[in-house]
Amino acid sequence: MAKEKIIGIDLGTTNSVVSVIEGGQPIILENPEGQRTTPSVVAFKNSDIIVGGAAKRQAVTNPNVVQSIKSKMGTTSKVNLEGKDYSPEQISAEILRYMKNYAEAKLGQKVTKAVITVPAYFNDAQRKATKDAGTIAGLQVERIINEPTAAALAYGLDKQDKEETILVYDLGGGTFDVSILAIGGGSFDVIATSGNNKLGGDNFDEEIIKWLLGKIKAEYNIDLSKEKMALQRLKDEAEKAKINLSSQLEVEINLPFIAMNESGPISFATTLTRSEFNKITKHLVDLTIQPVKDALSAAKKTPSEINEVLLVGGSTRIPAVQELVKSLLNKEPNRSINPDEVVAMGAAVQGGVLAGEVTDILLLDVTPLSLGIETMGGVMTKLIERNTTIPAKRTQIFSTATDNQPAVDINVLQGERAMAADNKSLGQFQLTGIQPAPRGVPQIEVTFEIDANGIVSVSAKDKNTNEEKTITISNSGNLSEAEVERMIKEAQENAANDEVKKKNIELKNKAENYINIIENSLLQAGDKISAEQKEQSQKMVDEIKELVKNENYEALEQKMAELEQAMAQAAEFANKQNESDPNNNSSEQNN
């Protein structure tokens, strides 16, 4: 019987993450939607309880949706849902129960124990409420630990021999926290905290939404600020644009059939540059300055006395935020671990310590299987082929997939399949600090080396900056000979199918996205379009649904091409009608 795991949970204001120790290292467990982070949102609908992304998607249309319940923990406030009062602990318990359940499904075993993280500033009542939420969810909470402590654990800073002062800059979806820790001899002491519990990534999204509403109003004289369906689509596009602007200098925002006017459907498209994004969100970035200064003052430290700066929270990916941190503290921040996941990983490390699972290196059995990395499009690129005699060393040059990409994620793989997802992941790390350049220009030197003892070292080096990161792996996953043979056989049998699979999945996702857009547009349009137009649109939707259902990808590809052409023509017609409408022009001039 497998030893019971102690999972680590980052119960966040906006998103939550669950991690567990596997082979001595923390891994993130994906939720049923295939996502590594789960929105901390709970919805009630006809007595059904919905958690995560499905609940978040109802936020605009369902009044019985609860978000950011973490801010109410430790208070006596209640939330009334479908006529019944619920405490913050009960709502948080639904999030924890959801994560517990999918952790059990992923691990294939019962999960009853957890380490849960809380902000360093949480008082006793808030900490007890968090523990109570875990108990309600059916979890024995082994430890409540501070989020900055968890981040330091994930970075391995507990192994430092000397005493150091660490600043953790945590800008999440809904809150901002700064913590300063004294670390030494395996102990962590939070010596100062500061922050703003009403500042986070959601605020950046809102600024993009306001910018988009203004652009649509100026171009079409239509106010969508009260249109729930349109606002939900604007929010989705704003969040995507914000994320993409962390690695791109500009993004295209396309909103087909976002509204209707006398001329017909309106398809809106615009470009948001990183420069414009920085301009409309500068006041938000600047709001993080004073809390950093306050924390330094409370800790009686100067920037030069800070040994390490850790970035936590997805919003720290924003380049302007990173630049601000660097200028404030005169130090390049450490962002080598995914900022969305680092706290949960630290909680898992603590759980691993309590369960006696944590070791210094990732253990894995060296087997006659190929070793490589995941490259663009989710493909596995092999560096050391199976049956290579050890010791062995192989080096290959790779590059970036997008313009001005600041970092590359190295996913170390073992197996014979063409697609990365079908192989075994042995470990992951990130090479950061890549200087802005067009895609394909930076030279990233990846080296695999296996010594006589079967210890695998994987390094990635930026040849321009000489920045380098390394992961050490030993004993490739405890694979038996039978498992090795099975993996080789599967690779041979699926070689052709692997190449087709990715293309079909992408096509299906694209089709389902268009179906959703058209159906929402028809619903929003109401009586603004003719019955004939509705019938034609619905007929096309039904045809696409049938093709998706029957997995007729060849016909689906042709139908999607026809749909895209029709949408482009509709958008062009609507824009021409708008340009030639004198009433619209005069109304714009009067605004």
From Swiss-Prot:
Provide the alphabetized UniProt keywords.
Answer: ATP-binding, Chaperone, Nucleotide-binding, Phosphoprotein, Stress response
Q: What induces it?
A: By stress conditions e.g. heat shock.
Instruction: Write out the biased-composition intervals (Polar residues).
Output: 580-591
Q: Which InterPro entries match?
A: ATPase_NBD, Chaperone_DnaK, Heat_shock_70_CS, HSP70_peptide-bd_sf, Hsp_70_fam
Q: Which domain of life is it from?
A: Bacteria
| Residues with the Phosphothreonine modification | 175
| One Pfam family recorded for the sequence | HSP70
Residue ranges, annotated region (Disordered): 568-591
Ranges annotated as biased composition (Low complexity): 568-577
Q: Record's PROSITE patterns?
A: HSP70_1, HSP70_2, HSP70_3
Describe its function.
Answer: Acts as a chaperone.
| Classification via PANTHER family | HEAT SHOCK PROTEIN 70KDA (PTHR19375)
Protein name per the record? Chaperone protein DnaK
Q: Which organism is it from?
A: Mycoplasma mycoides subsp. mycoides SC (strain CCUG 32753 / NCTC 10114 / PG1)
